[in-house]
Amino acid sequence: MVPPIPPRPLRAHRSTPLSGRIRVPGDKSISHRALMLGGLAVGRTEIRGLLEGEDVIATAHAMEAMGARIDRQETADGAGVWTVDGVGVGGLAEPADVLDMGNAGTGARLLMGLLATHDLTAILTGDASLRGRPMKRVTDPLALFGASFVGRSGGRLPMAVRGTATPLPVSYRVPVPSAQVKSAVLLAGLNTPGETTVIEPVATRDHTERMLGHFGAALRLGRDDQGATTITLTGQPELRAAPVEVPADPSSAAFPLVAAVLVPESHVTLAGVGMNPQRIGLIDTLREMGADILIRDPRIEAGEPVADLEVRASALTGIEVPAARAPSMIDEYPILAVAAACARGTTRMHGLGELRVKESDRLSAVATGLAACGVDVTVDGDTLIVHGKGTVPKGGATVAVNLDHRIGMAFLVLGLVSAEAVTIDDGRAIDTSFPGFVTLMTGLGAPISLI
C-alpha cells in the first residue's frame, strides 16, 4: 500500500516591501482548452506557456489515453514547449483505464462534453475534493445530446460516461452563469451534426469561443428576444492545428498583485497577464477601492487580450461589489476578502453562492479563516461582509485549507500584512494551479516558508 503523502504546512510572516518583475504560470482555463482542442485538431499544435500544474497535467493524460500524442520539449531557459498531435473531431478512442482528473474540476467537466458525443464509454474519478463536487448541472444538458451518465448520489464522481453514437443538436439556456457548463455543451456540439446553440443570459468567460475560432470552428454570436447572448456552433468541423501562446493566469496573478497592493512601499510588475474582459473583475474592483494598478502594453496573443500590470502599494477603501460582477471574478473572492480585511470601511460582496460548490465551501472557509485572524466578518446568505479597519489584521491563526489552493494562497498573503504570522495547514493543493508559488513570492521578498 502506498503511504499517504504528509501535509505541507506553510507560514507567512509580516513582510518588508515587495519588488520585482515576474510572470505567473499560464492560464489554467486556457491550458485545459488548448490541450483538448489540440487533441481534436488535424495536425500538430504547439503550445507555449502551458500551465504545468497538476490539474492541467491530468487533462493531458486524459487526452493521451484517448489517442492524442502529447510531448514536452524544454527550451534553453527551462520553459516547456508542448506539442499535441490530434486525432480529428470524432476520432477519440475509448480509454483503456479510468481517467483520474485529480482536483481538476474544469478538466473533468469539459472532458464530459467531449465524451458525451463520442461512441465510447469512459469512467472519470478524482481526488477527495473533486469527488465531492456536484456534476449534475453539466450532465443534465449533456444528456440532451443522447449521452448517459451513472455516478454517485447527486451526480458525483466516480462516474461512468456512455457517449452517444447518434448525437442530436441541442439548444440550451444556461440557468446559472457558468463558463464550464457553456463550454461542455459547446464541446459536445463539436461532434454533433447540425447546429448546437447555448443561450447565456449573463456573460461568462469566453475562452472556449475564442479558442474554437482560433482552431477554425464556425461560431455565430447573437442576441435572443430577451437580450441574452446566443452562441451557435456548426458541428463536425475539421479543426486545424494552430499555435497557442497561453497568457499568464489572471486568477494566479491575483495573489502577488494583492500582496503588492497591501504590503507597504511595494512595487511589482506582472508580465503578460490575460486581460479577457470576463476575467478582470478583481482588477476593476481593486481600482475602485483605490489600488494603484497601471495597465501597460495591452496586446492580443492567440486571440486573447494580454497586458503587463504595474502595481504599487495603496490604501484601500471598502465598497459594494455587485452580484453582476461575480462571473468575472468568481475565483478571486478569497483574495479580495483579504484585501477587504486591510481596507478602511466595509466591503460587501454579493452573489457568492457559486463559492459553496468550488474545491471547498469557499464562502465558509474564507469567513472562518478571517475570523480566526481577528477580522470582523459575517456571511448573510450569499453575501460576504468584511468590516475593515484600515489597520494591520491580528493574524496568528492556523487556517485549514481543505485541499483548496486558492484558500491557501489567500491566507498566506494575509500573513504578509498581519501582526502575527499566519499558517496554512497544508500547501500541497497550491501545485494544482500555481507550481512555484512560494519560490516566486520569496523572490519578491515575501517571507513564506515550509514549517
Curated annotation (Swiss-Prot):
Pathway: Metabolic intermediate biosynthesis; chorismate biosynthesis; chorismate from D-erythrose 4-phosphate and phosphoenolpyruvate: step 6/7. GO terms for biological process: amino acid biosynthetic process; aromatic amino acid family biosynthetic process; chorismate biosynthetic process. SUPFAM superfamilies: EPT/RTPC-like (SSF55205). PROSITE patterns: EPSP_SYNTHASE_1, EPSP_SYNTHASE_2. The keyword Ribosomal protein does not apply. It comes from Rhodospirillum rubrum (strain ATCC 11170 / ATH 1.1.1 / DSM 467 / LMG 4362 / NCIMB 8255 / S1). It is found in: Cytoplasm. InterPro entries: Enolpyruvate_Tfrase_dom (IPR001986), Enolpyruvate_Tfrase_sf (IPR036968), EPSP_synthase (IPR006264), EPSP_synthase_CS (IPR023193), RNA3'P_cycl/enolpyr_Trfase_a/b (IPR013792). One of its GO terms (molecular function) is 3-phosphoshikimate 1-carboxyvinyltransferase activity. Gene3D superfamilies: Enolpyruvate transferase domain. 3-phosphoshikimate binds at K28, S29, R33, S178, Q180, D331, K358. Phosphoenolpyruvate binds at K28, G105, R133, Q180, R362, R406. It is an enzyme of class 2 (transferase). It comes from the Bacteria. This is 3-phosphoshikimate 1-carboxyvinyltransferase. CDD domains: EPSP_synthase. The active site is at D331 (proton acceptor). Belongs to the EPSP synthase family. Its EC number is 2.5.1.19. Catalyzes the transfer of the enolpyruvyl moiety of phosphoenolpyruvate (PEP) to the 5-hydroxyl of shikimate-3-phosphate (S3P) to produce enolpyruvyl shikimate-3-phosphate and inorganic phosphate. Pfam families: EPSP_synthase. Monomer.
